[in-house]
Amino acid sequence: MEEKVLDLLLTALKDRGLVKAGGRQRTDSTRVLAAVRDLNRLELAGETLRATLEALACAAPDWLAGAVSVREWADRYGPRTHSWHPPASTSKREEMALVYGRDGFALLEAVHAPDAPAWLRELPAVQVLRTMWVQNYHRTVTEAGAEVKRRESKDLPPGRLRLASPYDTDARYGLKQGSWWTGYKIHISGSCDDADGLDAATGQATPLGADGPPPRLITSIATTDATVTDAEMTEPVHHMLAARDLLPAEHFLDSGYASAELIVGMKKNFGVTLVTPVLMNSSPQARAGAGFDRTAFTIDWDKRQATCPRGDTSTWWSPATLRGTKAIVIKFDKETCRPCPVRDQCTRSKTGGRTLSLQPRELQEVLDHARLQQDDEQWRARYGTRAGIEGTIHQAVAVTGMRRARYLGLQKTHLEHVFSAVALNLIRLDAWWNGHPLDRTRVSHLARLDLSLAA
């Protein structure tokens, strides 16, 4: 249901020929900060335990009074962690972390004791405490007693599973372009057709009041936790567009959304051409811009053979799996490569022959074609269309405050994003109908919007 309001708007816009399938669209993502504080591991442990005690004090005050030393724990966990400064000494901070750990395990034991009300362990705050302690602490029980230790960084669970806040259990730590944050990511898709393309594809006249190119409207909004990569969302975004019958013929994306597999898969499964740069050849020769990289070799897929720049052929062709993906490994005989006068320009191996690693034929040919296109000035000018999505993201952040979540949890945050997308579409429609420049919209335009569209 959270998508309903955007679905209704886009259906009305499709009926008026303002959005359509088969045109051009562009997509990009940006970070969203959760409505919680950033906490280090010490603060996270203390605040999680404090939040659990607060929940138990409300749900079962009489039981809590008999289970823990209320006065001592109230002094320790009464204030929120951001209201005081932790010790400056590393040893004292480590000792405080162990105190938190021992207290947390003691509270969990009390909650799960046979004489404790069974429903206490079902409280969300208790569930969060249990998960947080499993992720951050070790406990070893011996005849001498229980020993509690904090997990080392290498022993922490992967970021996609690791809780970042006791209050928003969907928020995660994210990293993009060297920037860390706690929260989510949003993927925004929007139309970017020109006027001629729109009229030719829909067969409809330009709506009254329109002037210049058609409005750039948001067609899809996807919200994920901060650890989900752009490439993981390429297919889901196309499924969302297909469900609205708004799949483009060309989809402009940055390299984070693309791979040879995705370029081929989107064309086969959705009929969509991804217009996107791909990662360049990462071989030592290609990075140095000197010597013979893979493109200097001729590949005969039918004969399963490669020919080097000097005309020698490979002696080994074998399917393989490299870093979890299918590949083809090609090798040249070391006796052929060893006396070669240009050996230093071809391989860094001191004794062996040259080795090539290729993707399966269909993927490799798509990758080679995409890399060749990227060097063409005409393709670069065409790809410049993608840059407009940055303006959409800027408007979303400046006008609707999309950079910061207002609510806790992924579902409510996504609902907020859907309503923000609808608001931006209405603002852009009003600006377009009233003859304002496409990318210079103001919130005040919304007040003059003709509400016949919504009706």
Label every model-predicted segment.
Residues 1-455:
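Anion-binding and metal-coordination hotspots
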